[in-house]
Amino acid sequence: MSSSSSSLLLMMLLLLLLLLTSKLEAIPVLSSTSPSPGVRILRSSESIVAPLDDEVVFECETSLPPERFEWSYSNTSSSSSAISSSFIYLSSVAGKVNISHEYAISRLAIVVRPESLGEYRCVGWFGPLVVTSTIARLDLASISLATKKESHLNWRTAPGNSIIWPCGQQVQANPLASWSFYKNGKEIQPLNHNGTLILNNISSESNGVYSCMATNTASGVRLPIPSSMELHVTKQEGSKSPYLLFGQPTRQSVTTREGQRLLLVCPGVGSPPPIPVWSSPNVTAAVPNKRSKLLSYGLEINPVQVEDAGIYICYLDNGIRPPLELYINVRVEQAPVIVQAPWAGSLTNESDRLQLECQAKGEPKPTIYWLLNGKRSHEVNQSQLLSNGRYLVLKKVLKEHAGYVQCFARNHLGEHSAGTLLQVNPKLVNETDLVVSRPQRPKKLQIMVPPSAPNVTRLSDESVMLRWHVQRNEGLPIQFFKVQYRLINEGKRKMWQTTNENIPYGKPKWNSALGKNFTASVTNLKPQRTYRFRIMAVYSNNDNKESNTSAKFFLQRGSSLEPMPVPELVKIDEYSETAVVLHWRLSDDADEQSITGYYAYYRPSSFAGEYSKATIEGAKARSFHIGSLEVGTIYEFKLQSFSADSASEFSALKQGRTQRSKLTTTEQPIQQKGGDRNVNTTPNHNETYSLNPLLTGTIGGGALLLLLLIAFSFCLCRRKNRNGGDGRNSQNKPRLAELREDFLPLAGGGVPGSKQRQRSRHIHITLNPLDQQQQQPLDEKNTNTNLNSPHLEADPELVYFQRQQQNHPTTYDYDHGQRRLSSSSLRRSQRTLERTPGSNNNLQQIGSETTTTGQRVILKRPRLSSRSENLSSGSLNSVGV
C-alpha cells in the first residue's frame, strides 16, 4: 500500500465525517388543529309561552355526558331581573313532570298550570363538578285590552297624503299579537307595523270605515278592538301647511329589541302633501346610514342596534310655513352578554386569595350573580361580592371550592353565562408523629405521601395526557410511578389496568417550594368511552400507595370537536451548555382564555425514541427554560397547548442546540505602548476558541486512523525487505537433521546412582566450538556438583544429551552479527521443530546407543519457550529460563 493511496483514503473518510456532522436546519412539519370541547352547557332551554293545560318540553345539552342530570324550579311571577334563591330540584316520582335523558341531552316535559309557571334550569353533574344552564321561563299565553274605552275617529284629508292609524295601542299580549285589518267589514292586507295601519298615497278609493283585530299566536285567541276610523278623501281648495289629524300624537315613545326591524312613522298631512326630513340631536350618523331607509311616511332602521337609541326629529314641510316638528324617543333593549368571562388559571393553592372578574353589557343594565358548583355565592364559605357582583372574591380558597365557577348576567330579556374551572392544590396534611413506646426517645416514622389525583387532558382519539403533583414532604422517597385506568360502563365493573411504563421520580430535590409536577401519556384507549385514572407511587421500602381517582373522563372523537389554538415555535436560544430557552407565540385570533397551559416535547435529533415532556402552566406564558440537556447537542422541539379537557395538535417541529463546551486559552494582559496602556488583550468570552465535541472527536479519530495507516505501510515495507534478505542468508542456516544430531539422550534418562534435581532453573546449551572450549571446565565443575547433590531427583521431563563430536563432527559458521534474533524468529523455529514427525523418536534412538559418559552433560527441556533459546546461524545459545 503506497503513501499516496493512504492519504487519499484518509481525505475521503474525513470528508464523509464532516458531511455527516454538519449542522442540520429546522425541518418544518405541517400541523392541523385539534378540538377543545370543554365541560359546559352547549344548549340551554329557551323560554316558552304556552296556553293553559298545554304540555311543553324544556331541553338542554352538555358538551360531555354527565354522571347525572337534574332540573331545578323556582315559582316566580314575573321575568324581572330579580334573582330567585328558592330553586328546588324536581323529580319524576311525583308525576307532575317527566324527565328523560339521552346521551348528553336531558328533556323535561311539564303540563302548563298556574302552579307550574316560573323559571327552570338544567344541572349537569360531573363528579364533584356541577354545571348549570341559564334560566328558561314558562309563561301563560295571554291577550287583553289595557282600556275598554271605545274610540271612533272621523278623518278628512286631501289625496296624496299618508294616513297612519295606531289601532293596537291599547292591546297587551304575550307573546306579541298578530293583526288583521278590515275595511267596511272586509279583511284587507295593508301595510302595518305592530298594530299600526299605514295607508300610503291615499285617493278617493281609500274612503271607508277601518277596524282591526288582534290574535294571540300561542293560544289562537282573537280579540276584536273596540275602535274604528272613518276616512274621507276630498280635494281641498288652496294650500295648507302640515298638520296632525285628530288623535295623532306630537310625541312618541318607541321600545324595541336589538336586531329587530324598527319603523318610525311621521304622521301629518297637508296640501300639498308634506315631505318628511329626519335628524337626531344625540344619535351620531343616524340618518342616513347603511341600515336606514327613508320612506314617504317614516324612517326604517333594520337591524336596529343599541347605539341607535335616542331622540329623532321628523320635519314635515310642504313649502308652506310653519313646518311641523314631531319628536320620537327610541329605546333599544339588549339581552345581557358577558364581555369578560372569569378565569381562575391552571391551579390555585389552598388558602390563597382568589378574585374573579365578570363584565357584562345589556339594556337594561344586567344584574350579575355567581354560582359555584350550583350553589349561590352567599352559600359558599369565604366568598364575597364586590362592585355589584362584578367581582367574586374567595378570601381563603378551600378544597370544597374546587369545581366549576359560573358568572350569570340577567335582565328581563334573559340570561347569559360564562364559567371557569377552579382547580385547588391542597395543602400537605402533616400527620401526627408516631412515637415508640419509650416516651423519652420519641421516634418519627416516615409516611408514604401519595400523589395528587391526576388531571386528564385529551390528546387524540386514543390517548390522553395525565398531570399530577407531589407535595413537598418529609415522607418516604418515591422511586417511580405507575399509571392505572379503568373503563366505566353501565354493566359489570371493570378491573384497574396498569401501564407497563415506569415513570421515574427523577432527582430527589424539589422543583419549587410546593413540590414537583409530573406528566405521562396513556395510549391505546377507545374513543366514545368513559374512563377513570389514578397514579400509584412506589416508595423506597418497595411498598406502594395510590392517589385519589380522577373525575370521570369521556374520551370524545376529535371529528366532532372545535379546534384549539396551536402555538407557533418562534426560536430556540442557546441558554447554556445544558439548557435552552423556547420562545413561541399565538395567532392574533387565538382564544387565549381557552388555554390552560402548554406541553413541550423534546429529544436529541439523532435519537428516534420517545420524546421527553415538560408541562408549562399558564396561558400567558411565551417562553420556557429546559435544562438537564447534553452538551453541544442538537435537539428537536415541538409544542401543543392544552386545556382541562383537550389538547391542540403539535406545532411545527423546530431544532435547536445547547452551547458547545468551551476550550479557553487565557493569555496575560499586554499593555500597549503609546496611547492606551490599559488595553487588555486577553480574549473575551466571544473570542474564546471553542470546538464542537463531535468535531473534536472526528479530527482525533482521523489523526489516529492516519497513524494506523502509516504504521501499517511501514510494517509492509519492513516485511518486504526482510523477505529479500532471508533468501541471501539461507545458506548459513543449519539443517534440522544436523541440529538433531548434536543432541544425544543419556541411556536410562538419568545418572545412575545419583539423585537429580526436580528442575534446573538454568540450562546452558552451546554448539559453538569456541564457547565449548571456554565453557568446558566450568560445565564439568557444575555437572559434578549437580550429580553429587543430594537434592536431585528423577524427573521424566528432563532429558540429558551428550554431544558426540568425535563420531559426528559437524561444522557451523559463526557470525557475531547474528547471535540473537527476534523472539518471533525463535517461535517460528520452535514450531518447525514441533511439527517435524518422529523427531523425538530419532533422538531417543540415538541416545540409546550412546554411553552414559561423555565430555559434556547438558540439561535440556523437551519444549523450549521463546525466552529460553536464541537461534542464530551456526550457534544455539542458552539463556536463563
From Swiss-Prot:
Disulfide bonds join 60-122, 167-212, 266-314, 358-407. The gene is iHog. The chain crosses the membrane at residues 694-714. It is a single-pass type I membrane protein. It comes from the Eukaryota. Residues 450-558, 566-661 form the Fibronectin type-III domain. Residues 37-138, 128-228, 242-330, 336-425 form the Ig-like C2-type domain. Homodimer. Heterotetramer; 2 iHog chains bind 2 hh chains when facilitated by heparin, heparin is required to promote high-affinity interactions between hh and iHog. It holds the Pfam family Ig_2. Residues 865-881 have a biased composition (Low complexity). It comes from Drosophila willistoni (Fruit fly). Residues 27-693 are extracellular. This is Interference hedgehog. The first fibronectin type-III domain mediates a specific interaction with Hh protein, in vitro. The second fibronectin type-III domain is additionally required for in vivo signaling activity. It is found in: Membrane. Keywords: Disulfide bond, Glycoprotein, Heparin-binding, Immunoglobulin domain, Membrane, Proteoglycan, Repeat, Signal, Transmembrane, Transmembrane helix. GO terms for biological process: axon guidance; compound eye development; cuticle pattern formation; homotypic cell-cell adhesion; maintenance of protein location in extracellular region; segment specification; smoothened signaling pathway; wing disc anterior/posterior pattern formation. The keyword Protein biosynthesis does not apply. SUPFAM superfamilies: Fibronectin type III (SSF49265), Immunoglobulin (SSF48726). GO terms for molecular function: coreceptor activity; hedgehog family protein binding; heparin binding; patched binding; protein homodimerization activity. Belongs to the immunoglobulin superfamily. IHOG family. One of its GO terms (cellular component) is cytoneme. SMART domains: FN3, IG, IGc2. Residues 715-881 are cytoplasmic. Mediates response to the active Hedgehog (Hh) protein signal in embryos, functioning upstream or at the level of patched (ptc). Gene3D superfamilies: Immunoglobulins.
